[in-house]
A protein has these predicted regions:
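Small-residue (G/A/S/T)-rich helix-start motifs and N-terminal tracts that mark the onset
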Residues: 4-149, 157-175, 179-246
Length: 246
């Protein structure tokens, strides 16, 4: 494995040499993350912060769509539309009253692709299941989508059987697999180093960003550059964490 703990240690190398040396690997720290958060203008409104679409949930898995929708709202999105099967509509409307609920034609699962032109980002996957109808709907949804995507959970499991679709995703798209979901797409790995290398190769070939989730999540760019997020903790090892991270 890659070890249990990542730390930056000063071993008295030349500071100038370190700053001039190129590396594809970097450890993110709190001050670097804080610098990425843009301050909000006093006179801003919800239209300034984008409209996202979330395609999530199936009958018996409404919780996945609720958790993902709540997390999306808390992340600061201006507007959120949730596309869900009819039988999940009531609980979604009650649990996430801020969201706009769009009904799928199916009572129980994602079966009908929806237009994405009016959105700035589209998330697909939490709790959608892997029925034949959902598989067909996902592939059709991806084939015509020009909006950046965040693909997770069952969306990735479906794509593992249709790897050609990974190379046609819109620019700026993000895949957020946990280790097993990644291995379904790239093949079994003997250790975490091999898994990281295969994730970097997938990011380059598919021209997508990949967040390989774990205690030290690896954020991989389409160029293959890798940033490690050290803020994970064992408290996240519980049902629903992945849906929130989407």
């Amino acid at each position: 494995g890659l070890g249990d703990v990542y730390k930056r240690q000063d071993i008295n190398l030349s500071r100038e040499a370190i700053e001039e040396t190129e590396s594809n690997y970097a450890l993110l720290e709190a001050e670097e993350i804080h610098a990425l958060i843009k301050p909000r203008n006093t006179f801003s409104h919800k239209g300034n912060f984008g409209h996202a679409l979330l395609i999530a949930g199936s009958y018996g898995m409404a919780g996945a769509s609720i958790l993902a929708a709540r997390a999306c709202m808390r992340s600061g999105v201006g507007l959120l539309t949730v596309h869900a099967p009819i039988r999940n509509n009531d609980i979604l409307q009650i649990s996430v009253p801020e969201a706009i609920i769009e009904s799928d034609a199916s009572d129980t699962y994602f079966a009908c692709p929806t237009d994405t032109d009016d959105y700035q980002a589209v998330g697909i996957g939490p709790g959608i299941g892997r029925s034949e109808e959902t598989e067909a709907a996902l592939l059709e949804q991806l084939s015509g989508c020009q909006t950046p995507l965040v693909l997770d959970a069952d969306a990735l499991n479906i794509l593992a059987n249709h790897r050609h679709a990974l190379t046609t995703l819109p620019k700026g798209s993000i895949l957020t697999p946990h280790p097993k979901e990644l291995e379904r797409m790239v093949g079994k790995c003997q250790n975490s180093y091999e898994r990281l290398m295969k994730a970097c190769e997938l990011a380059r070939t598919a021209k997508v960003h990949i967040i390989l989730k774990g205690a030290y999540s690896a954020i991989i760019t389409p160029s293959g550059k890798c940033y490690f997020n050290s803020t994970g903790n064992p408290g996240m090892a519980t049902a629903g964490s992945g849906d929130v991270l989407t």
